[in-house]
Amino acid sequence: MTAQPTKKLYISDVTLRDGSHAIRHQYSLEHVRRIAAALDAARVDSIEVAHGDGLSGSSFNYGFGAHTDLEWIAAVAETVRHARVATLLLPGVGTLHDLRAAYDAGARVVRVATHCTEADVSRQHIEYARELGMDTVGFLMMSHMTTPAALAQQAKLMESYGAQCVYVVDSGGALGMQDVRERFRAFKDVLRPETQTGMHAHHNLSLGVANSIVAVEEGCDRVDASLAGMGAGAGNAPLEVFIAAAERLGWQHGCDLYTLMDAADDIVRPLQDRPVRVDRETLALGYAGVYSSFLRHAEAAAARYGLGTVDILVELGRRRMVGGQEDMIVDVALDLLARRSAQAGQAVPSAAVA
């Protein structure tokens, strides 16, 4: 039987980073301050803030942010008294210069994120973060796309570069509970005892909280979650729900549940221009194993070309597209449009391919 945790869990909030996807990266500085103040009052351990795609993610490909990463980071740093300010960096999107600037703005935790089979590209960023004295975390995205043993070897690479914690990141919300269990057991087999592990869940199959609980049962130290589940796709594990479940299990988490409940309903949920929930489109993400932040891009392409969002998402999953390939969503839409036109014996309208 799995042992119950006796240590205090590290609660990592991602409302102001992953949650940015849910509103197309349009958080105002006032939104950021209000959310950060509520999270700080609830005593979460860290608050991650950046464009949804990490430092320097604001771009034509990913979507432009309402503010710069440094403005958002500084707003959180000026607000909090307890929580540490965290940020996310994807090598190839964010640079060492961006990391230094984020540190100067107040970030003290960085999660260096790569695709689950590409940990080797994180070396210089992890090493530099350690030089800065940051709490340095490896973040293995789309963890469902490789085996537990192979994922563990990638985690070991990140550990060897200096990562103090390595995450199983279910970017597609596609992992089942046994999948999570097997990945944490594989981590335990190869990582040093002092290296922490973390779980970042998405709720596309409604398993965000369940998978986080399984991870903790397997020795996970850090849990990502967001207020009202605010995040890409069907969102992350809802923070207030996870804390309520952890409380009922008798786990030490250090957070004020009622403050989180109020913040979720009174501050965060009203910001959603598209409900963050499991529905036809977000369920397709988890079913097909598609990167959750593709949702809004796929919906835009579907509207533009008169296609079904689910059809685009399922095709993206079939082609095993990964984070960073947002530009391919339009290509997939055009391929589907051409296929449909060919079946109907029609040419693709020239306006559609312009």
Swiss-Prot record:
InterPro entries: 2-IPM_HCS-like, 4OH_2_O-val_aldolase, Aldolase_TIM, DmpG_comm, DRE_TIM_HOA, PYR_CT. One of its GO terms (molecular function) is manganese ion binding. GO terms for biological process: catabolic process; L-leucine biosynthetic process. Substrate binds at R17, D18, S171, H200, Y291. The keyword Secreted does not apply. Residues 9-261 form the Pyruvate carboxyltransferase domain. The active site is at H21. It is an enzyme of class 4 (lyase). It catalyses: (S)-4-hydroxy-2-oxopentanoate = acetaldehyde + pyruvate. It holds the Pfam family DmpG_comm. Belongs to the 4-hydroxy-2-oxovalerate aldolase family. This is 4-hydroxy-2-oxovalerate aldolase 2. It comes from Cupriavidus necator (strain ATCC 17699 / DSM 428 / KCTC 22496 / NCIMB 10442 / H16 / Stanier 337) (Ralstonia eutropha). The lineage of its organism: Bacteria, Pseudomonadati, Pseudomonadota, Betaproteobacteria, Burkholderiales.
